[in-house]
């Protein structure tokens, strides 16, 4: 599913919106965790890089994905709700070898209360962040798209309950791309990879890591803060502000870019 997301972002960055959204829909049909970075599509929609009609690809590709199982005899109602069923399987822990906020506050107590509070918290944070970004009239460059994927991938997984150690795989892939653009940020990728390897190591060796997950969660928080600062700097860099500061000027700039690319 990471390969599908990479293809999706590639086509979206090159203004081939339908192709990009078909790949995103295919990724969603494969893996629910595709939703971790869904807010970046909302930002592209606000900036008129994606239209509402393009989002039809998500349910269409999901239906295509469940069609073989339906034909084979599995109940359609069960197939439609399979992601909801999967989301309720890990109720025994708030964080499964994942360095996020629940490793700091304790991931084995008040499970139901923290799950509800955590979901409300991340929804509130995402709404505030997306509203703030929507009012910033900046150019949607390829670098910014990559940065958005990394940012939302880190943000959502840090606050959503029941995260597994493998759920940062997608973010790590895009973080590598981002650090190849911003070489001075390469230590962030090295650090993020270390955190991922710690979780994998415990799974493979069945032994607890030498460093507590609480300490690792603070390191992950530091990475999130640094990436957030990169987003803030981009939004407030005068070089990235649109001429006229309107969505219309963003559309004109996009048309110019498409014209130069021959799309």
Where do the protein language model's features map onto the residues?
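Perimembrane helix-loop-helix junctions
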Residues: 36-60, 71
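Aromatic-rich transmembrane-lumenal/periplasmic boundary elements in polytopic membrane proteins
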Residues: 54-100, 104
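Aromatic-anchored segments of alpha-helical transmembrane domains
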Residues: 62-68, 151-159, 191-205
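Aromatic/glycine/proline-enriched transmembrane-helix motif characteristic
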Residues: 84-158, 232-235, 245
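Multi-pass, polyprenyl lipid-linked donor-dependent membrane glycosyltransferases
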Residues: 1-6, 30, 167-168
């Amino acid at each position: 599913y990471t390969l599908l997301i990479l293809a999706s972002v590639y086509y979206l960055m090159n203004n081939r919106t339908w192709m990009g959204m078909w790949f995103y829909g295919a990724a969603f049909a494969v893996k629910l965790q595709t939703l971790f970075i869904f807010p970046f599509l909302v930002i592209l929609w606000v900036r008129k890089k994606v239209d509402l009609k393009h989002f039809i690809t998500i349910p269409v590709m999901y239906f295509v994905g469940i069609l073989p199982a339906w034909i084979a005899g599995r109940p359609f109602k069960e197939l439609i709700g399979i992601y909801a069923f999967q989301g309720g399987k890990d109720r025994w822990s708030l964080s499964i070898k994942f360095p996020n906020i629940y490793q700091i506050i304790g991931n084995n107590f008040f499970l139901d209360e923290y799950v509800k509070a955590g979901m409300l918290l991340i929804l509130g944070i995402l709404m505030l962040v997306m509203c703030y970004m929507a009012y910033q009239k900046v150019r949607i460059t390829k670098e910014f798209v990559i940065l958005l994927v990394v940012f939302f991938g880190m943000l959502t997984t840090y606050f959503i309950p029941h995260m597994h150690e493998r759920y940062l795989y997608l973010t790590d892939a895009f973080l590598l791309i981002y650090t190849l653009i911003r070489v001075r940020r390469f230590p962030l990728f090295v650090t993020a990879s270390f955190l991922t390897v710690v979780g994998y190591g415990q799974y493979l060796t069945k032994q607890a890591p030498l460093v507590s997950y609480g300490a690792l969660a603070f390191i992950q928080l530091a990475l999130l803060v640094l990436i957030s600062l990169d987003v803030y700097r981009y939004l407030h860099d005068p070089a990235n502000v649109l001429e006229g500061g309107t969505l219309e000027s963003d559309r004109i700039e996009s048309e110019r870019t498409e014209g130069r690319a021959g799309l």
